[in-house]
């Protein structure tokens, strides 16, 4: 396998395209999901206004077009933008037809205008992105890449390191270390963990891991999910699991249906008891949120107990408050369209646009903390938004952040012009990253950077400051790996010619 990697790199782009059978299977799954979404939005929401349904359908259509282009083989390379667009299904489209308590406070005409805004944003972004991915670029003369055996071992080491970091952090054993240092270490480990999960899941889908490597990867992945969920924050585990599924789908060209169902059932079940756990360990006086590793069984047993209690109570009580934190659904918690609705309702008449205030801080966020001990928080832009729209005081925003997402932030800064500018920027960035990673092996600098872009593309609540700071820090780490561990290798044209002939 090592020799094959040295002379015959595994490209992201396939020559020819994936076998027609697999392509057809992928398209069938796409159409089943698409028709299911449209049916839900049109027929299963009797209490929803026609204008709200129209807004949801517009967003859904625009969200699915990039995925159709990729599934049908018209778009090449890594599907960064398609997966980014899909996040708008649960963050923007479904909340319009799911009786979201905050979204319902706005008029149906506001829903339609928001839907048109999102659809226009995604449509323009798709046009820009498609320009870069509709054709295959010439092969590079060389690339920098990890040796495949060393690369797999390196990322297995990263995963176990991530598990140990979670354990130490959950137990409070890192409290003596400077907060700024911990933030840098955490960001680095999170970025490398995302890369490791994607690379190893991709290799698992290609059946290029040995039995031992495959078992270790699955074991470390489960351990990572367990230790990250101990914090009572499900978003981290959900993101890692989603990244693993995406990578597997890209390489195997099949949906792991059973794994997805098991994951959704577990996360949904834990969600039921999360509120009680947070109330007891986050907000109660004299309580501690630190959990020692030997207490994990008791911790999860208690959590499971609260979830079962909620389910049993829900069966016997039909009138539970639908807007309570405990009752909040996945769609309600993941939604950010209410922030766009707020910005469109208030600006520019009642509250002025920010005119780039949340973007002006970006250069400062790129300065390493070691060079600026008073460096501002990456969430500073989010605080500016929440204070400006009177959602929080600055002190409150430091303790708890209300996420806006890139699109709502762009509207709050410049209105529709800001949304259009963001579409062009993201379409270009994701398109260029995708094109750059075509014809590059999975462990090359180009592909790892594209994986990094994908891992951040579905962080739907990130403001520009958080997004740029996290991407810059992780990119710096990849650059360091490239300089220290990667070697310059020439591309073997015979490998690609061989792929074309198969």
PLM regions: where:
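Membrane-interfacial loop-to-transmembrane alpha-helix junctions, especially the N-terminal start
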Residues: 21-31, 74-87, 147-157, 208-217, ...
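Hydrophobic, membrane-inserted alpha-helices
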Residues: 35-39, 62-65, 195-200, 216-225, ...
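Membrane-embedded catalytic interface detector for glycan/lipid assembly enzymes
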Residues: 127-285, 491-497
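Aromatic-rich transmembrane-lumenal/periplasmic boundary elements in polytopic membrane proteins
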Residues: 262-377
